[in-house]
Amino acid sequence: MGKHAENGNAAAERPRFFGRRQGKALRRNALGLIEDLLPRLTVAVPEPDERVEPALLFPGAVRSVWLEVGFGGGEHLAQLAEDNPDIGLIGCEVFRNGIASLLGHVQARQLGNNVRVFPEDVRLLLPALPDGSLGRVFVLFPDPWPKTRHADRRFISPETLDVLARVLESGGELRVASDDPIYVAWAARHLDAHPAFEKILATADRSAVPADWPATRYEQKCITGRAPVFFLYRRRAR
């Protein structure tokens, strides 16, 4: 197990972040959402040694808490929140344009009761979460960092899987998707090798994917022209 798994309550050192935090200039409405709605939904960066109880981030009782790493435009997370009002959804994203997009969905669909946003690197939040506190984690179409010299920037890694294994409940799900063949092979190798995870599904057949797995905008646009591969792994019983 990695050091984060062994010491889940250790203070998270701020990791180096690679990627954009802002794209095109935000329009007035989007800026208004960032200024007015985001503060009401934000999960603060934990203090050293702070524990963050995910279920207590929501105003009402939730049956489970699910977390999405890098939610992009927020379509997937918003659909899950709408379909599962008794589930708390935490979306982690640093890209302000994507955050504004999710906030638009939250406002239009009135999802403020079961959506929370961590607008920072998810690696700052995960160490503060208690063992077995999440029911599902989603890592959908992360930056593949296809060059070999950038392999250490890929989110799926033995160390990250240690952390996810710690915070997922027994039987909890890790859902991963990518359309980059290098990342697909990388993710499959590390997921298959990790003793805490059991493979349930690995397919490029969208019809074989569970019905409660909404498509992301990236997937719908099919930017690369390559068929995505979908992985579903289950956290083995402790």
From Swiss-Prot:
- What EC number(s) are associated with this protein in UniProt? 2.1.1.33
Q: Which residues form the signal peptide?
A: none
Q: Which GO terms describe its molecular function?
A: tRNA (guanine(46)-N7)-methyltransferase activity
HAMAP family hit by this protein = tRNA_methyltr_TrmB
- State the PANTHER family in the record: 3-DEOXY-D-MANNO-OCTULOSONIC-ACID TRANSFERASE/TRNA GUANINE-N 7 - -METHYLTRANSFERASE (PTHR23417), PENTACOTRIPEPTIDE-REPEAT REGION OF PRORP DOMAIN-CONTAINING PROTEIN (PTHR23417:SF14)
Under catalytic activity, the entry for this protein gives: guanosine(46) in tRNA + S-adenosyl-L-methionine = N(7)-methylguanosine(46) in tRNA + S-adenosyl-L-homocysteine
Please give the superkingdom of this protein's source: Bacteria
Q: What is one GO cellular-component annotation here?
A: tRNA methyltransferase complex
- Which taxonomic lineage does the organism of this UniProt entry have? Bacteria, Pseudomonadati, Pseudomonadota, Alphaproteobacteria, Rhodospirillales
Residues binding S-adenosyl-L-methionine, per UniProt: E68, E93, D121, D143
Name the positions where substrate binds. Answer: K147, D179, T216, R217, Y218, E219
Key words, A-Z: Methyltransferase, S-adenosyl-L-methionine, Transferase, tRNA processing
Q: Which gene encodes it?
A: trmB
Member of which family?
Answer: Belongs to the class I-like SAM-binding methyltransferase superfamily. TrmB family.
Q: Which SUPFAM superfamilies match?
A: S-adenosyl-L-methionine-dependent methyltransferases
What protein name is recorded for this chain? tRNA (guanine-N(7)-)-methyltransferase
